[in-house]
Amino acid sequence: QGTFDGMTIFENKKFSIHINTANGNTLNSPRGRYTLAHELGHYIIDSHRIALELGFLEPFPSKTNQKEHNSVERDADYVASCLVMPEIRYQKDIVGKKFDFDLIKFLSKEYNVSISACAIRFAQIGNHPIMIIYAESGIIKWTYYSDDFKYKTIINYPKISEHFLMGEYFTNHIKVEKTAQIW
């Protein structure tokens, strides 16, 4: 329990997808739906499937938030986001709407996905510049930003500046509500 969310395996000349339901990955949960779509991504992407089949790629236990730096995992995440948040429908849902955190929360509920998965999809196909930062204990683990995000260089890896809201949170343990202007 808790060791992985999903894994795609090839053994005995068969593919199988393992979903860790003990880790909150039920079929109707945001995490479970996305995990299943992510693992299907490994099967759908020819290079992943063939590499697993030939033994060039070892089965990798996917864990939410710990995979985004790995290009193989990002490829599978992209396929997953396309499956659970189709581009045309997603763009129809955002057209004419003001960008703020409430929009991301609305889309997250609409598509039954996590807020982070929804924000990353927004960075891929949305209509407003956005950067997503994932950090643990004040250390940046990964970032994702839209092509039109102008301030990519403001992030000072690996530590978060205390001048950012996230930095204030890690430095002073102060939770700050974000307004649309801060975004």
Positions of the model-derived regions?
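Active-site hotspot residues in diverse enzymes, especially metal/ion-binding acidic/histidine motifs
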Residues: Q1-W183
